[in-house]
Amino acid sequence: MSLREEGGFCVAVLEGRNLTKTFRQGKLEVPVLHGVSLAVERGEVVALEGPSGSGKTTLLCILGCLLTPTTGRIVIDGQVITAGRPERLRDVRRRSIGFVFQQFNLFASLTASENVQYALNLKGWRGLKARRESDRVLDAVGLGDRKDFRPRDLSGGQRQRIAVARALAGPASVILADEPTGNLDSESGKIVLALFREMARTESRGLLIVTHDPLVRSVADRVMTIRDGRLTHGEA
C-alpha cells in the first residue's frame, strides 16, 4: 500500500518507507535517521528543511540511491528499488532521478549543450536524440542562446540553470535538489526556483528540495522539517 493514495491509485512518484540509517564510527553504531516516511507526488514541489546535522542530506542521498538505508524501502514510479543489485540501482539513478547540487559540478571544458548531452549519454541517449533533448531543456531554462558558451563565460545563476537543465534532460520523473540556491544571489535564486516550479507542473516531475533558503517556501506545495533524524512536520 502506498503512503499517499487517491481513489485507490498511487499518486506518489517517490516514496520512502520507514527509513533508518546507521553509520559505524569505530566500535559504535551511530543512528542518523529514525523511521522516516515521506512521499512526493507528480507535479509537486516539496521542501525539506532542518538544521545542520539533522539528517536531511543523508535522507536525500538514500532517496537518490546514492546510499543504502539500514532498514526501510524506497519506491520510485511504483517499483521497490531498495533491494536491487548495485547495477540496478545505478540504472534507476540514471533513468528515473535527476540531481541538482549546490556546487554546479559542470565540466569547465564543455559547453552548456555538451554538459547536458554528457548526462544524456549516461542515460543511453546519443547523437541527434541527445542534441535535440539538450536544446529543448536549455530553451526551457532560458539558455537556448547560450548553449555554445562554456561555464566560465556565464554567471552563477546561468551555470545553475545549466545544472537544472541537466537534471531535467531525459525521462527522470524525480528531481532531487540539495541547496540549489546556496551559491546564488537572491534574484538568481528566484529565477531557479521559478524554473523548478514551472518544470514540476508542466512536465509532471516530482521535486524534493533540501534547503535552508526561506525563498523555497514560496514555490513549495508542502514543507517538511527534519530534526535529529526524525520528520517533525509534514510526514506522509
Named regions from a protein language model:
Residues V223-E235:
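H-loop (His-switch) and adjacent beta-strand-loop-beta switch element
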Residues A12-I226:
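ABC family nucleotide-binding domain
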Residues M1-T22, T232-A236:
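ABC-family P-loop ATPase nucleotide-binding domain
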